[in-house]
Amino acid sequence: MDSSFPDWNIEFREQNESYFMESSSCDMSLAMSLLSIIIAIIGLTGNVIVLQLLGFHMHRNAFSVYIFNLSGANFLFLCTHIVFSLENLIRQFHYIDIHMALFSVNVTILAYLAGVSMITAISVEYWLSVLWPTWYHAQRPKHTSTVICTLLWVFSLLLTLWNWIICKVLDYIYNWDMCWKLALIIVVWLLVLFVVLSRSNQALLFRVFCGSQQTPVTRLLVTIMLTALVVLICGFGIGICFFYWKKEENSIMPCGYFYETILLLSGVNSCANPIICLFVGSIKHCQFQCGTLRLILQRAIQESPEEEDEEVEEVVEQEGGEEDEESTTL
């Protein structure tokens, strides 16, 4: 009897098990890619609604300017997120060369850096408003939010352009040290944002629950805290991935969970803010209450305590009535 026959059976069984595990992994990757696309579509819809309401139907304040820019950054990120999810979905079957990939990568970096910077700026500004309320409401420059948002967009754009010029336009191989150093600078900036965001939220929690002076819990505070929590959990994974990211030319995307998980978490991070605004704005006196999207968003970014809801609702209704009169006259 041939002694190699049992070895052949063992090898055949190991190959079947390996094929089954690889097939299951690819099926899971396929499901995660489809889920990422669905989440991105939901997030795009929510951010478009927020942009439309804050841009054309509501009076802006200091924090609504930040939220408007945050929604704009999330909208850009989700647009490219769908491109990468579709690319990852297709590459699980065969290689495809998407010429928009380089443009999508640059827009993704820009939108991601701007979005993380915006939520950090919102958290820090709210912390300053709680720490020094007199200075904030009396002596704070009127257009501070607009100036800060512009500077954050410009800084994010500069980092993105430097990444594109050094790592893509110039020869990637000969400028490896420069590209690596630039990636390190971006990661250090993300770590700074991570520390500032986490520490400012810890300071807010301490001020609210353990401070000597009673600080009221407003809906805006809840919105900021929940959004910051989602960013800390889901948002910084793609920054770590960027540090190790390397473009692989002419290769089929491997079936693994890491890349799909990063895509899924980044999509959740970018679509969370409209959902959080809808959730926070719908709660009134510990009960869910329906209303127009405009009223719900106004509640979610309300700086005053919950007892002053009636005044906010009256103002929103008056503004809505004025817009209706203008539309009828036109």
UniProtKB/Swiss-Prot annotation:
<feature type="topological domain" description="Cytoplasmic">
    <location>
        <begin position="199"/>
        <end position="219"/>
    </location>
</feature>
<keyword id="KW-0812">Transmembrane</keyword>
<keyword id="KW-0472">Membrane</keyword>
<protein>
    <recommendedName>
        <fullName>Mas-related G-protein coupled receptor member B8</fullName>
    </recommendedName>
</protein>
<keyword id="KW-1133">Transmembrane helix</keyword>
<comment type="similarity">
    <text>Belongs to the G-protein coupled receptor 1 family. Mas subfamily.</text>
</comment>
<feature type="transmembrane region" description="Helical; Name=7">
    <location>
        <begin position="261"/>
        <end position="281"/>
    </location>
</feature>
<dbReference type="GO" id="GO:0004930">
    <property type="term" value="F:G protein-coupled receptor activity"/>
</dbReference>
<dbReference type="InterPro" id="IPR017452">
    <property type="entry name" value="GPCR_Rhodpsn_7TM"/>
</dbReference>
<feature type="transmembrane region" description="Helical; Name=3">
    <location>
        <begin position="102"/>
        <end position="122"/>
    </location>
</feature>
<feature type="topological domain" description="Extracellular">
    <location>
        <begin position="1"/>
        <end position="33"/>
    </location>
</feature>
<feature type="topological domain" description="Extracellular">
    <location>
        <begin position="241"/>
        <end position="260"/>
    </location>
</feature>
<dbReference type="GO" id="GO:0016020">
    <property type="term" value="C:membrane"/>
</dbReference>
<dbReference type="InterPro" id="IPR026234">
    <property type="entry name" value="MRGPCRFAMILY"/>
</dbReference>
<feature type="transmembrane region" description="Helical; Name=1">
    <location>
        <begin position="34"/>
        <end position="54"/>
    </location>
</feature>
<keyword id="KW-0325">Glycoprotein</keyword>
<feature type="transmembrane region" description="Helical; Name=2">
    <location>
        <begin position="63"/>
        <end position="83"/>
    </location>
</feature>
<feature type="topological domain" description="Cytoplasmic">
    <location>
        <begin position="123"/>
        <end position="146"/>
    </location>
</feature>
<feature type="compositionally biased region" description="Acidic residues">
    <location>
        <begin position="304"/>
        <end position="330"/>
    </location>
</feature>
<feature type="transmembrane region" description="Helical; Name=5">
    <location>
        <begin position="178"/>
        <end position="198"/>
    </location>
</feature>
<feature type="region of interest" description="Disordered">
    <location>
        <begin position="302"/>
        <end position="330"/>
    </location>
</feature>
<feature type="transmembrane region" description="Helical; Name=4">
    <location>
        <begin position="147"/>
        <end position="167"/>
    </location>
</feature>
<keyword id="KW-0675">Receptor</keyword>
<comment type="function">
    <text>Orphan receptor. Probably involved in the function of nociceptive neurons. May regulate nociceptor function and/or development, including the sensation or modulation of pain.</text>
</comment>
<feature type="glycosylation site" description="N-linked (GlcNAc...) asparagine">
    <location>
        <position position="16"/>
    </location>
</feature>
<feature type="topological domain" description="Extracellular">
    <location>
        <begin position="168"/>
        <end position="177"/>
    </location>
</feature>
<keyword id="KW-0807">Transducer</keyword>
<feature type="topological domain" description="Cytoplasmic">
    <location>
        <begin position="282"/>
        <end position="330"/>
    </location>
</feature>
<dbReference type="Pfam" id="PF00001">
    <property type="entry name" value="7tm_1"/>
</dbReference>
<dbReference type="InterPro" id="IPR000276">
    <property type="entry name" value="GPCR_Rhodpsn"/>
</dbReference>
<feature type="topological domain" description="Cytoplasmic">
    <location>
        <begin position="55"/>
        <end position="62"/>
    </location>
</feature>
<feature type="topological domain" description="Extracellular">
    <location>
        <begin position="84"/>
        <end position="101"/>
    </location>
</feature>
<feature type="transmembrane region" description="Helical; Name=6">
    <location>
        <begin position="220"/>
        <end position="240"/>
    </location>
</feature>
<keyword id="KW-0297">G-protein coupled receptor</keyword>
